[in-house]
Curated annotation (Swiss-Prot):
GO terms for molecular function: DNA (cytosine-5-)-methyltransferase activity; DNA binding. SUPFAM superfamilies: lambda repressor-like DNA-binding domains, S-adenosyl-L-methionine-dependent methyltransferases. This is Type II methyltransferase M.Sau96I. Its EC number is 2.1.1.37. It comes from Staphylococcus aureus. PROSITE patterns: C5_MTASE_1, C5_MTASE_2, HTH_CROC1, SAM_MT_C5. Keywords: DNA-binding, Methyltransferase, Restriction system, S-adenosyl-L-methionine, Transcription, Transcription regulation, Transferase. It catalyses: a 2'-deoxycytidine in DNA + S-adenosyl-L-methionine = a 5-methyl-2'-deoxycytidine in DNA + S-adenosyl-L-homocysteine + H(+). One of its GO terms (biological process) is negative regulation of gene expression via chromosomal CpG island methylation.
Length: 430
């Protein structure tokens, strides 16, 4: 979307607005933000275009140059107005000061470990699952691991935090809000795990936050769930941006898409010299043969004899369509007759492709992920490699608990690039 600068200058004269500085003040953005809006190198946020049009007392379409970008008149809150398609290479970014992170729903530590790799320091990590909490303690004894209910922590935050926090992070579950959109505040979110996350954000007021979730959040409950979240973040005083990031683009041998929401505190946005941008995709995308070399031995869930005989017939890169028809029918049951979504059944991954999204169980029928050569699921350490955990990162609990922790984790390398994009942004203020 490009703005019609000539039209804007004319409208400024009509409203007796003499300078860009005055215009920026009326829109309640910084002068640099306004300059970015006018630059052909940046995509202006639709919400800022709407605010600009409101100040100039015109329709947004009167100041948009490209006809294909014209906005619907009197449009309601639209989650896509906050989708940011601006990226920057952060491969070589280094911090110029220390930034600390308070993480919620930490799980096995994929997000926290990735942020640490980006140069950020974990002040505290909240995790109620005993095995995941123990995983964090084993690997990072110096982290303040808080094994407690997130709602209790949100209500008694002063008991757990005694210093200023730079970044709040976490991946709360995707849940429907009972009154989504009616009040557009905390009350909409009571009874969900987003509520304590937003309450912690409200109390800490960090410079920035990272909220990570499944891709399905974008259209969950017809988009209402995401829109309520964005409204809450905005009311708390944050500029918000989101996008879908595919882990395969960020040194992870796995096609795993997640929505990442970034919030920047408004006072920083007004002072910024350059805006936040998401990390640019890396040129090389790893495949299984890149990450599954010399993997340490570890436990693995075994197939049943019947399933093993079926999976022996599937070639690398293949699935149920490569099976003899009668065997496929017997194996798939009712799924044979249902339409679509069956390519994950009896799936054997090839060495020359990334893994499909790992789940919390390595041998579920609908989301099979069979080893390329051996007729078995991926082992614990193979699972961890695919999620870009280092070999020295230990997982607590039984085999099932370990698979669950790894399958639920944010891939470490994806988290690293997200962290680097925030470090790049925050570095400008030092």
């Amino acid at each position: 979307m490009r703005l019609n600068k000539g039209s804007i200058i004319e409208k400024m004269k009509n409203q007796n607005i003499k300078t860009q500085t005055e215009l920026a003040e009326k829109i309640d953005i910084s002068k640099s933000q306004l300059s970015f809006m006018f630059s052909d190198e940046y995509e202006p946020l639709k919400k800022n275009v709407i605010k600009l049009a409101d100040v100039l007392k015109v329709s947004p379409n009167d100041i948009i140059l490209d006809e294909e970008d014209q906005m619907p008149i009197n449009s309601d809150f639209n989650r896509y107005d906050y989708k940011l398609d601006e990226f920057i290479d952060v491969s070589n970014v280094r911090k110029n000061k220390d930034y600390n992170v308070f993480e919620t729903f930490a799980g096995a530590g994929g997000l926290a470990l990735g942020l640490e790799s980006a140069g950020l320091s974990t002040y505290g990590a909240v995790e109620i699952d005993k095995n995941a909490a123990e995983t964090l303690r084993i690997n990072r004894p110096k982290w303040k691991v808080i094994e407690n209910d997130i709602e209790f922590i949100a209500d008694n935050l002063d008991e757990f935090i005694d210093e200023e926090i730079d970044i709040l992070s976490g991946g709360y579950p995707c849940q429907t809000f009972s009154y989504a959109g009616k009040r557009n505040g905390f009350a909409d979110t009571r009874g969900t795990l987003f509520y304590p996350y937003s309450k912690i954000l409200s109390k800490l007021k960090p410079k920035a936050f990272i909220a990570e979730n499944v891709r399905g959040l974008v259209n969950h409950d017809d988009g209402k769930t995401l829109e309520v979240m964005l409204k809450v973040f905005i009311k708390e005083g944050y500029e918000v941006y989101w996008n879908i990031l595919n882990s395969w683009n960020y040194d992870v041998a796995q096609k795993r898409e997640r929505i990442v929401i970034i919030g920047i505190r408004e006072d920083l946005v007004k002072e910024q010299k350059y805006p936040f941008r998401f990390p640019l995709a890396q040129v090389y995308k790893p495949v299984l043969k890149d990450v599954l070399k010399d993997v340490p031995k570890s436990k693995v869930t075994a197939y049943s004899d019947k399933k093993r005989e079926v999976m022996k017939l599937v070639p690398p890169g293949g699935c149920w369509v490569d099976l003899p028809e009668q065997i496929a029918k017997d194996y798939m049951g009712k799924s044979w007759y249902s339409g679509g979504g069956k390519r994950g059944m009896a799936r054997r991954i090839s060495w020359d492709e990334p893994c499909l999204t790992l789940t919390t169980s390595p041998s579920q029928k609908q989301t099979e992920r069979c080893h390329p050569d051996e007729t078995r699921p991926f082992s614990i350490r193979e699972y961890a490699r695919i999620q870009s955990f280092p070999d020295e990162w230990e997982f607590s609990g039984g085999v099932g608990a370990q698979y669950r922790q790894i399958g639920n984790a944010v891939p470490v390398n994806l988290a690293k690039y997200i962290g680097k994009s925030l470090v790049h942004y925050l570095n400008q203020f030092n």
